[in-house]
């Protein structure tokens, strides 16, 4: 009897997994694990998986653009050992990631995300708050997007204070 109840209990417990409308599903670094993290391909995969929101990380390049990447150094996912904050967007765009993918800017990511999906932008590097705020204000004024489309997070309290 015990052997019969265990599978029935599991079936009952997991049969309701798709019926949880109040749970928010967020793709971490896009759809990390399905596509290379923080790339356009990863964000598109997260959209295909019907997430409610997507989390990405940003650093500011030497030339001032916000770059979507998790680490300060490019070494983990490319052949470059450069640090994002020390090189220009032109140089970053010439760097090839694993699988021949490229490193996107924050604008490129925002441009492909549907209105119904929110974006959690993690401020990873120094001096990212002001540029992120400026980009969000631009999108809010030029589109139908609302402030609830964007969430700002960071371990860098100084950047969060600047954002306010």
Language model regions located:
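Phosphate-group recognition and catalysis centered on beta-loop-alpha active-site segments
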Residues: 16-164
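Sec-dependent N-terminal signal peptides
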Residues: 4-14
């Amino acid at each position: 009897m015990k052997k019969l109840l265990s599978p029935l209990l599991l079936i009952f417990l997991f049969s309701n997994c798709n019926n949880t409308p109040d749970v928010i599903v967020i793709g971490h670094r896009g759809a990390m694990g399905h596509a290379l993290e923080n790339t356009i391909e990863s964000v598109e995969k997260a959209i295909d998986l019907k997430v409610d929101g997507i989390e990405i990380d940003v650093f500011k390049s030497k030339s001032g653009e916000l770059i979507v990447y998790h680490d300060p150094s490019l070494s983990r996912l490319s052949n470059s050992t450069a640090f994002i904050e020390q090189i220009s967007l032109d140089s970053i765009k010439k760097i090839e990631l694993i699988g021949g993918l490229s490193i996107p800017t924050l604008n490129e990511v925002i441009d492909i995300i549907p209105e119904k999906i929110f974006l959690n932008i993690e401020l990873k590097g120094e001096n990212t708050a002001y540029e992120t705020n400026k980009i969000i204000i631009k999108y809010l004024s030029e589109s139908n997007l609302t402030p609830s489309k964007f969430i700002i997070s960071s371990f860098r309290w100084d950047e969060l204070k600047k954002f306010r």
